[in-house]
């Protein structure tokens, strides 16, 4: 778990210290720095002379990202996190020519649901690697659901809110999707293809409905639920704009 984040001379932040917790919600007007906080964390994960270009983000050259008030000083990001009951501290200093890190940010797996996550489709791609991932745009969330649908959960160890619900991965996805949006979901392999078909149902319509025939927000919230339930101990889940396509009532339930 990330406990503290210090940001200096980065974008709108001249200097800021943030205390983070198991669950941290960033809220505010546009251009207030919410995404910049996420980008600062990614800068600690990505390597190279310009850590602002890589797998999780590509936001430009260092001189474009330095705070306009402080000028051309170095960008400094310091991160304190807890893993396996130990506190680790990582600091990175970034200039136009190099990036110097005190130590690498290790041991924490990141699951990132970007604001550009995939939405309503007729079919969704399978992940072709060995261990199925969610993907930063939730590209493979429904393949993950298909693969782990019947995985049994332990109510003592796993995140189970209602022990009367079905104690499988898919059962918990359905529990939360029904609680928030009033739907259930099924992800099925399309034989002899590299694609997954997704069907929704509810109490009024028990047969499968295509994603295009239900509200757009249903698909977006389903991806978030899958990503959240896929997390293991010590994982870091980052969701950008979780409220996309949700009615205010759905936002409140989320």
Locations of regions flagged by a protein language model:
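Switch/communication elements of ASCE P-loop NTPase nucleotide-binding domains
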Residues: 1-52, 175, 190-254
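Phosphate-coordinating catalytic segments in nucleotide- and nucleic-acid-processing enzymes
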Residues: 47-227, 232-233
């Amino acid at each position: 778990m990330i406990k503290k984040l210090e940001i200096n001379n980065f974008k709108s932040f001249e200097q800021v210290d943030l205390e983070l917790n198991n669950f941290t919600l960033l809220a505010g007007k546009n251009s207030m720095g919410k995404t910049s906080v996420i980008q600062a964390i990614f800068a600690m994960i990505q390597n190279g002379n310009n850590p602002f270009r890589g797998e999780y983000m590509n936001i430009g050259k260092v001189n474009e990202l330095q705070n306009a008030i402080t000028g051309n000083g170095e960008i400094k990001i310091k991160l304190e996190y807890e893993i396996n009951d130990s506190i680790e501290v990582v600091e990175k200093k970034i200039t136009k020519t190099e990036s110097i890190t005190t130590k690498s940010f290790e041991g924490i797996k990141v699951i990132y649901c970007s604001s550009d996550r995939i939405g309503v489709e007729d079919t969704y791609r399978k992940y072709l690697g060995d261990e199925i991932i969610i993907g930063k745009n939730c590209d493979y969330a429904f393949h993950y659901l298909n693969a782990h649908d019947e995985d049994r959960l332990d109510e003592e160890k796993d995140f189970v809110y209602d022990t009367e619900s079905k104690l499988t991965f898919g059962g918990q996805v359905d529990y939360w999707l029904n609680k928030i949006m009033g739907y259930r979901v099924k992800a099925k392999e399309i034989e002899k293809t590299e694609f997954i078909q997704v069907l929704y149902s509810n109490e009024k319509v028990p047969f499968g409905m295509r994603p295009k025939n239900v509200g757009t927000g249903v698909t977006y919230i389903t991806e978030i639920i899958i990503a959240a339930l896929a997390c293991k101990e010590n994982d870091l889940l980052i969701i950008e704009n979780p409220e996309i396509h949700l009615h205010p009532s759905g936002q409140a339930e989320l």
